[in-house]
Amino acid sequence: MRWMLRCTISISLLAASPAMAQEEPGALCRAAIRAEEAAAGIPPGLLQAIGRVESGRRDPATGRIAPWPWTINAEGRGHFFQTREEAIAAVRQLQAGGMRSIDVGCMQVNLAAHPNAFPSLEAAFDPVTNARYAARFLSELQATRRDWARSAGNYHSNTP
């Protein structure tokens, strides 16, 4: 009887593991932003709110507005992609056409204004790397302005 129970549990876990391994994209941004917000000492929810404004879309899995990791903004137009690979390919195509000012990822970091933010385009679309840079940048703004609200207001309209 115990053997049968163990087999049933093992089969159930094996069947569930692909679903568990494939976390929905909005959750990747939320978790990365929350962790980097705490690590940088940013008031809880502030970086998350900026992320929702910058790359928010209705998450198909939850119905909530959440930062979306596979987002780009080029010439004022936001584009949401289903995969990281699609987003990277779109940025490469835009760059090949001469466009340089492109916002990428959960926190919509501008590649022209922040040319040294990421070692590669792939890294720019990594939710943790993207959120980490955004947290550092917001913290730098706060250090000079001494005001979180003003710093948040300057997040997208200020260069490093």
Tell where the protein language model's regions lie, with residue ranges.
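Sec-dependent signal peptide recognition
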Residues: R2-S10
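N-terminal signal peptide c-region/cleavage motif recognized by signal peptidases
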Residues: A16-P18
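Catalytic glycan-binding domains that act on GlcNAc-containing polysaccharides
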Residues: Q22-P160
